[in-house]
Amino acid sequence: MAELHIIGQIIGATGFPQNSLFCKWGVHTGGAWRLLSGLREGQTQVDMPQTGDMAYWSHPIDLHYTTKGLQGWPKLHLQVWHQDSFGRCQLYGYGYIHVPSSPGQHRLQCVTWRPLGSWQDQLSEMFVGGGPQLRSPDLIYSGADRYRLHTVGMGTVELELCIILRHFDRYGVES
């Protein structure tokens, strides 16, 4: 079968309202893809930079897939969270990015967004914290009902991925 290796890292995030950020990530694929090695999801550590607004995670990603076709090419979905001084966590943004289909090293930026909520939600968020979250994280990468959401743009997550394709031509999979 054709093989895909994804090796890289989630470098960090910038442009968020506050520091002390961490990132939950996962990979979504179609039914023809099988994970041979690596973790399908994970979480970075919390980084609270002393200077600047860039939170650095340098979180490794190392995945090895086999596939019979290109349908359902892997997508990386991200959730950026803020942890306050009391240890409470608040969602700061959702985002997703398609894994590049060309071999080589790629530096990527994933823009993030979060649901806006009503003015009552926004007022409550200002005083109590929290805020609206998606009921189903599948909405992050499937565009079915995402167009109906009222959202606000948040920061950007930087990634560096190296893509290795193996035996795609041998098995008739054209990339």
From Swiss-Prot:
GO function term, MF aspect, one: gamma-tubulin binding
Localization of this protein: Cytoplasm, Cytoskeleton, Cilium basal body; Cytoplasm, Cytoskeleton, Cilium axoneme
Residue span, C2 B9-type domain: 2-118
One Pfam entry name: B9-C2
GO cellular component: a single term: ciliary basal body
Gene Ontology BP, a term: cilium assembly
Main location: cytoplasm
Keyword Cytoplasm: yes
InterPro entries: C2_B9-type_dom
Domain of life (superkingdom): Eukaryota
Keyword Cytoplasm: yes
Keyword entries, A-Z: Cell projection, Cilium, Cilium biogenesis/degradation, Cytoplasm, Cytoskeleton
PROSITE patterns listed in its UniProt record: C2_B9
Assembly and oligomerization: Part of the tectonic-like complex (also named B9 complex).
Role of this protein: Component of the tectonic-like complex, a complex localized at the transition zone of primary cilia and acting as a barrier that prevents diffusion of transmembrane proteins between the cilia and plasma membranes.
Family statement drawn from the similarity comment of this UniProt entry: Belongs to the B9D family.
Name of the featured protein: B9 domain-containing protein 2
Lineage: Eukaryota, Metazoa, Chordata, Craniata, Vertebrata
